Amino acid sequence: MAHLLEKTRKITSILKRSEEQLQDELPYNAITRQLADIIHCNACIINSKGRLLGYFMRYKTNTDRVEQFFQTKIFPDDYVQGANMIYETEANLPVEHDMSIFPVESRDDFPDGLTTIAPIHVSGIRLGSLIIWRNDKKFEDEDLVLVEIASTVVGIQLLNFQREEDEKNIRRRTAVTMAVNTLSYSELRAVSAILGELNGNEGQLTASVIADRIGITRSVIVNALRKLESAGIIESRSLGMKGTYLKVLISDIFEEVKKRDY
């Protein structure tokens, strides 16, 4: 019991991870590594759309084809759909099972390979799946208890992270709306023309050329750019005689200006 309690505490310590620690490209690599070390298995976490959030391999079990899934950080649609249909932990799935993570071409090499899939859901929201696998050793009840705890802990962390991201998006969109509201009619026309000159989110432009084309003064363009830059929506840099380099930092500005029909 003491051994199980110690392992449980290691897993629940995941909740102490800060938001900054979850900003990486694969934010749950450290978590899957911790889980893999505790349970002695390979582990990965995917969200409900199949995006890989983290993984750790203690043992070599996959072919180059499957390794590619981990490199591209996205799982095949049919596998993701199958995982999303699992509502309770499915333990010790054999290599012959459709949801085995062992690829078809390597099943002869790992005939005793076992896969366990635990759904990650919080408050009725399906957030993803926790997948663990071994080459030849069955997952015992103690392992499965830890997997259930881990999926719950990761679910809570995922939900918190998702809410924080939603709040950031709201603040970002609000900042854009407020900045656009400060622009005059002429400045809005200028911003619309400027955004149309960019190659994606950045580009080089000449204010005087744009001003002449849409029939406004150069100072209107300068004022519009200053307002957006002070709001943190764009950044600009003078290129001297070549004009101005402009980069959009918050892409919501494109949609906001489009909504104003300028």
UniProtKB/Swiss-Prot annotation:
Recorded phenotype for the gene knockout or disruption: Essential, cannot be deleted.
Residue ranges of the region described as GAF domain: 1-159
Key words, A-Z: Cytoplasm, DNA-binding, Repressor, Transcription, Transcription regulation
Main location group: cytoplasm
Pfam families, A to Z: CodY, HTH_CodY
Subcellular location: Cytoplasm
GO molecular function: DNA binding; DNA-binding transcription factor activity; GTP binding
GO cellular component: cytoplasm
Biological processes per GO annotation: negative regulation of DNA-templated transcription
DNA-binding region boundaries: 207-226
Gene3D superfamilies: 3.30.450.40, Winged helix-like DNA-binding domain superfamily/Winged helix DNA-binding domain
Regulation of activity: Activity of CodY is modulated by interaction with the branched-chain amino acids (BCAAs) leucine, isoleucine and valine, which are signals of the nutritional status of the cell. Whereas both BCAA and GTP are CodY effectors in B.subtilis, S.pneumoniae CodY responds to the intracellular BCAA concentrations, but not to physiological fluctuations in intracellular GTP.
InterPro entries in the cross-refs: ArsR-like_HTH, CodY, GAF-like_dom_sf, GTP_trans_reg_CodY_C, Transc_reg_CodY_N, WH-like_DNA-bd_sf, WH_DNA-bd_sf
The family this protein is said to belong to: Belongs to the CodY family.
PANTHER family: GLOBAL TRANSCRIPTIONAL REGULATOR CODY (PTHR40062:SF1), GTP-SENSING TRANSCRIPTIONAL PLEIOTROPIC REPRESSOR CODY (PTHR40062)
Function: DNA-binding global transcriptional regulator which is involved in the adaptive response to starvation and acts by directly or indirectly controlling the expression of numerous genes in response to nutrient availability. During rapid exponential growth, CodY is highly active and represses genes whose products allow adaptation to nutrient depletion.
Name the record gives this protein: Global transcriptional regulator CodY
Native source species: Streptococcus pneumoniae serotype 2 (strain D39 / NCTC 7466)
